[in-house]
Structures are given as C-alpha cells and as structure tokens.
Amino acid sequence: MAVNIYDLAHDLDKGIRETPEFISLQDAYREVNENADAKAKFERFRDVQVTIQEKQMTGQEIDDETVDVAQKVAQEVQENELIVKLMEKEQAMSTIINDLNRIIMTPLQDLYNVAND
C-alpha cells in the first residue's frame, strides 16, 4: 500500500499542535504579546536576531555596534520573566523538532550508510 507522505506530514503538524510543549509555547507567546513592555522587547530582540542572521548569510561583517546592540537587547530580554519563560518553551519545542528531524532523516542516513558498506 502506497503511503501519502504529505498526509503523514499533515498528521504530524496536527500532532505537534496538540503536544503539551506546543500548547505551553502558545500560552507563553500570548502572555508576552499581552504585555506591552515584554512584547516590545521581544520584537526588538527578534529584529536584532534577523539583522545578524542576514549579515551572516550575506557574508557581511558583524560590526561592533551591532554586537553592542545585540548584547544590550539580550540582557533586557533575560531580565523579563515572560520572555525568559517563552524562550524556555521555545527550547522545549526545538528539542522535539530536532528529534523529529533526526527520525525523518533516518531513511537517508540508512541508505547512505548501506551504500558505503
């Protein structure tokens, strides 16, 4: 019987959304967005992250000013308990996603390992 891999992917999507980790992440994200100070700091933090990633991807040097801003914003974020909680929940979801990715990649790893034996 042929498996529709996309149906499995949609089932996985649904399953992820039903995990306690995802639900906790949603709750933490909502709490950050409901607090004006936390929301502003979190948005600024994400903007700085995107700026740094864009520079890295385009091979641009990350100047001292960008580093200073990133450090300052990171410090502000670490002082906000709502954002810290959100980041902890993100880390838990990241662990799950990494585990799933490892499982998904197993067939390719097995294929190449067999081919190299």
Curated annotation (Swiss-Prot):
InterPro entries membership: Com_YlbF, YheA/YmcA-like_dom_sf
Domain of life: Bacteria
Matching HAMAP family: UPF0342 (MF_01526)
Family, as annotated: Belongs to the UPF0342 family.
Protein name according to UniProt: UPF0342 protein LMHCC_0319
